[in-house]
């Protein structure tokens, strides 16, 4: 009877060993006119590593020679078994050689692996700072939700651009007068590619991209990855999942529906907590069509990739008045009104969003693990037989062929003469066109590519293939 109280007391004592951000930095994360640099943040990560809920991992050196930190957070019991949970995550993601029964058994044993990063675009300072606050709360809180998250999730909290945070924070904080501090950094915040570090995750030219890709695609293969960015569209607080169409047509449908499900959990949590201003789908410009970034490349590894773009700056700002955004709709069900906005509000929103994702992963742990196996198995099966991906140009070909045939036969275009039930639709086309055009053998998906050595971009092709091999 005394065991549970003693364990709880021990957990509280463990949490008390970790200093709060204010105790360590001298200010709260999110205070106006205050930023930490990476040297300070990394030193704080080492303080957090004193907790038995954590393991601090150096995932490699940056382009400027800094150590890139990843803090793994879970329950003390899970921390002792990280190798096993990593092995389960890899086996389910690879899917090869597993039966459904074996996959379900592994899914029941494993833990949801969730990646949360921050700081990739260093001038988007909410990202790196929400990471610090989230780490602290996960390491020190003992409420029921946090303990359930720690029990069911292995959380990979990763700094995406240490060099950039060092540069940007030092530049902003160089002014003694807080009112003179500005985010007008005069040079790139990644040594070679600056903002385009988020265009490097299919080629991995930069060391940071290589470090991150190894953890994502080789070591851990998380079921969910969450990439924090800025800025939110004018008249909103943030844009998040689900995203506007089109998505890439080759995705497994489970990618799309899982993004919808996690996005709903994120939006719902903010609404429960009285945090308005979340916009989705047509409310922003973000989609899943382009696939070379930190959030989008993982889709091809069957991970649920999440992106939020939030407002916020250590220098207070104002939420813009965009009249059309004040009317609730499916994209923005809970609009935000114009107001002054403080850095801490963005930190609080970000922590809430992280908790929404982690709570979802904890609640649906075994399903997430099984789903990534199922997507992997679907991909293997798809590669073993002929498969067609339908693109708009093929749909246009059907319409063109049908119109041509109708004209040639001088048929009445107002009638459906296919003998197939159309339920009043005027765009119904006889099914024979599906086989004749959409299933044309010429349009089959490729199962492999032959690259002749004399083609002009052969070195680029070799580089790309090596990048694929490196990333698993």
Give each language-model segment a name.
Residues 3, 13-16, 199:
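Cleavable N-terminal signal peptides
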Residues 16-56, 60-63, 67:
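N-terminal hydrophobic targeting/anchoring segments and the immediately downstream early-domain regions
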Residues 18, 60-62, 68-75, 81-91, ...:
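Surface-exposed loop and adjacent secondary-structure segments within mature catalytic domains
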Residues 18-33, 115-118, 192-196, 246, ...:
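Acidic/histidine-rich, surface-exposed loop or edge segments in extracytoplasmic proteins
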Residues 28-34, 117-124, 198-202, 252-253, ...:
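Second-shell loop/turn segments in exported
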Residues 53-60, 144-151, 278-283, 367-371:
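Surface-exposed patches in mature extracellular/periplasmic domains of secreted proteins
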Residues 272-472:
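Hard-cation-handling environments
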